Amino acid sequence: EARSVAGTLANEGYDVTDCIEEGTPVILEALHREKWRILHLAGHGVHEYQSARMSVTRSGMVIGLDTILTPGDIEQMRWVPELVFINCCHLGRMDGQGKTEPGVLAANLAEQFIKMGVKAVIAAGWAVDDAAGKAFAEAFYRRMVAGEFFGEAVRAARHDIFVLCENVNTWGAY
């Protein structure tokens, strides 16, 4: 998915930096170093995850062994992207309790980007089928770079996935 998105954007003249299969330090450095117009995050999302080596639970995107990209990491970004696409399972999920206990992150990545002022955020509200998620991302970006408005590009991509991937509910996750 990430390679396909990077290719689509590069073919339209966007300056693309990818961190595909990079380690945690490279990912975090790139996230904070550049002023991103479009930020596409693809990976596995976790909610209130804790491994044997972690002292507290974390919610966010897995970016390495026992390393989770959290809303706190996002909050430290110097610049606010215009568009953020988070294609991970569970990352659109909200904690209805609004927990503020030490070490517990009540917010998720999508919510943090919205709080920061990102103009448009796409995030999956539940676990998505990998193939359908990739197809959604490709359909969305194809339309965006062709000049369609954000809402119409999302609607049309959802429709495409509803038709193409009729046995999964991924179309409704975005």
Provide a role label for each language-model segment.
Residues 1-56, 86, 100, 104-108, ...:
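A domain-level signal for caspase-like cysteine endopeptidase catalytic cores
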Residues 12, 57, 80, 116-117:
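Short, structured coil segments at secondary-structure junctions
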Residues 29, 56-80, 128-131, 135-174:
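Caspase-like cysteine protease fold
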Residues 36-37, 82, 119:
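Conserved acidic residues
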Residues 45-79, 91-104:
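A short, glycine/acidic-enriched catalytic loop
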Residues 106-121:
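Conserved short secondary-structure transition element at the edge of the structured enzyme core
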Residues 119-131:
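Short acidic/histidine-rich active-site segments
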